[in-house]
């Protein structure tokens, strides 16, 4: 999974220069698609089963009060927006097995045949981006959410329990006046993108499955300025928003638990083993 994680991290690094006021949000989706075709990588979110429709895009792009799974679309980013970009990508593939450049990413049914049954190396990561100059409220939310991510990862030690992760995140976020989304959680990874165990970002220490060496997990706290409660877009069954219109932020890393501590697989260069 290292190759997949390195490639996904390079995408997020590239987005740092792309995302700015006036950018059409759809260009984020186009950038990810282009990079995937150049490096022969499958965007694994295309074709994921949904309650009302299969997910049709390579990215999830949430703005301000959007919590998760929002569709990329034509929207001009504004000064002060808070953007979250989430994606799941394969490792670079051998073209003799599959030539990704020849796939039609807009044909969801066709893509589903390649993505849903994929069982190779993959990586899952979401990152938040400040669009231009943002308010202190946005800065503080981003800081606390990022801190929640690393506080949770630090708890992913051999012998600890799943509940230790969520309890640490919840205690930190709520002590600073923020809400922790309950409906959407982290998860195990491999050989498919969503595996047991589920990893809540809230809970009680000392509870849940005991963590073992070799487990690959994601931690992806969604932290809100107001209540933790969210609504779902019933037209698509995918996008979520805060019910009170408050801001929501998310950061996500995928990592493997080693005897020496968690090793981040989607590191953008500033992280390592705790």
Predicted regions, residues:
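Active-site neighborhoods and metal-handling regions in enzymes and metal-associated proteins
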Residues: 1-274
């Amino acid at each position: 999974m290292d190759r997949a994680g390195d490639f996904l991290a390079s995408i997020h690094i590239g987005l740092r220069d792309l995302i700015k006021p006036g950018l059409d949000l759809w260009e984020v989706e186009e950038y990810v698609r282009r990079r995937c075709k150049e490096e022969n990588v499958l965007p694994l979110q295309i074709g994921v089963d949904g309650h009302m429709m299969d997910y049709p895009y390579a990215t999830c792009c949430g703005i301000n009060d959007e919590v998760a799974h929002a569709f990329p679309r034509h929207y001009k980013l504004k000064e002060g927006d808070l953007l979250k970009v989430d994606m799941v990508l394969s490792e670079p593939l051998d073209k003799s097995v599959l030539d990704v450049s020849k796939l039609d990413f807009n044909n969801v049914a066709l893509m589903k045949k390649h993505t849903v049954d994929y069982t190779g190396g993959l990586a899952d990561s979401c990152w938040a981006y400040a669009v231009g100059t943002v308010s202190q409220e946005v800065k503080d939310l981003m800081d606390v959410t990022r801190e929640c991510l690393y506080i949770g990862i630090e708890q992913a030690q051999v012998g600890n329990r799943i509940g230790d992760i969520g309890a640490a995140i919840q205690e930190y976020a709520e002590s600073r006046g923020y809400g922790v989304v309950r409906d959407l959680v982290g998860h195990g990874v491999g050989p498919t993108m969503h595996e047991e165990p589920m990893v809540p970002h809230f809970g009680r220490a000392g509870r849940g499955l005991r963590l073992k060496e070799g487990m690959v997990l994601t931690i992806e706290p969604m932290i809100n300025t107001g209540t933790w409660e969210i609504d779902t877009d019933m037209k698509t069954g995918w996008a979520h928003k805060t019910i009170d219109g408050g801001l929501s932020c998310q950061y996500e890393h995928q990592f493997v638990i080693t005897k020496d501590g968690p090793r981040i697989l989607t590191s953008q260069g500033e992280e390592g083993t705790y």
